[in-house]
């Protein structure tokens, strides 16, 4: 645990992500819980060589480099899986409210157990399909899932407040995917005014094939 704590602390310091000692401890505990639950439920790939604390936890925290989560802000984590990126960001920003949604009941059960074990009071896990979310809107929507950007934008358009933002963690070449999402503005009222991408490899070479996509309404 100490090795992971020092590794994560060094990465956060190196990349200008402010993190308290208590948050560091919780983030490392979450990584351990994620590893344990992943033996029971398929939450993240079991074939990866990079440690969970880097590949999944620190990867999620990189969103804080481009978005300033504010007290009272409401955030939806769409297709959260094992709580990524929602739980790490909820630990980092305890005054921001997070709702984690996934259509797979076993994954949400794991998230609920981890949230309870960590004592987090600013995050809720909900077993639901995104189409079933009614009467709620958010300041920010996050997603780490592999769904096409056009599909994520369609879901987000009705769930975001005015001037809301969709932030996705994605991999590979996204030029065609982004172009399709932007072109869809002509077909779908409410699609984002702009879509930008930030190659995370510019932040840290270990994520050379990863990108953050930001869609602004």
From Swiss-Prot:
GO CC field: cytosol
Ligand binding (S-adenosyl-L-methionine): 79, 84, 102-104, 130-131, 144
GO molecular function, one term: rRNA (guanine-N7-)-methyltransferase activity
Enzyme class: transferase
Intracellular or extracellular location(s): Cytoplasm
Any Pfam family matching the protein: GidB
PANTHER family linked: S-ADENOSYL-L-METHIONINE-DEPENDENT METHYLTRANSFERASES SUPERFAMILY PROTEIN
Family classification: Belongs to the methyltransferase superfamily. RNA methyltransferase RsmG family.
Described function: Specifically methylates the N7 position of a guanine in 16S rRNA.
This protein's name: Ribosomal RNA small subunit methyltransferase G
């Amino acid at each position: 645990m100490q090795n992971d704590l020092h590794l994560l602390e060094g990465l956060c310091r190196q990349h200008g992500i402010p993190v308290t000692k208590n948050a560091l401890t919780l983030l490392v505990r979450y990584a351990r819980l994620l590893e344990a639950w992943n033996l029971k439920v398929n939450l993240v790939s079991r074939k990866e060589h990079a440690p969970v604390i880097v590949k999944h936890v620190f990867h999620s925290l990189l969103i804080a480099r481009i978005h300033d989560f504010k007290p009272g802000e409401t955030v939806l984590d769409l297709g959260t899986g094992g709580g990524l990126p929602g739980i790490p960001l909820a630990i980092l920003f305890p005054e921001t409210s997070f709702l984690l949604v996934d259509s797979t009941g076993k994954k949400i059960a794991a998230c609920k157990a981890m949230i309870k074990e960590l004592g987090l009071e600013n995050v809720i896990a909900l077993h639901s399909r995104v189409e079933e979310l009614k009467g709620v809107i958010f300041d920010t929507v996050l997603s780490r899932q592999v769904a096409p950007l056009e599909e994520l934008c369609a879901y987000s358009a009705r769930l975001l407040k005015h001037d809301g933002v969709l932030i996705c963690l994605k991999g590979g070449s996204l030029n065609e995917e982004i172009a399709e999402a932007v072109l869809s503005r002509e077909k779908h009222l409410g699609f984002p005014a702009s879509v930008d991408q930030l190659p995370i490899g510019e932040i840290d070479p270990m994520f050379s094939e990863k990108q953050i996509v930001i869609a602004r309404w």
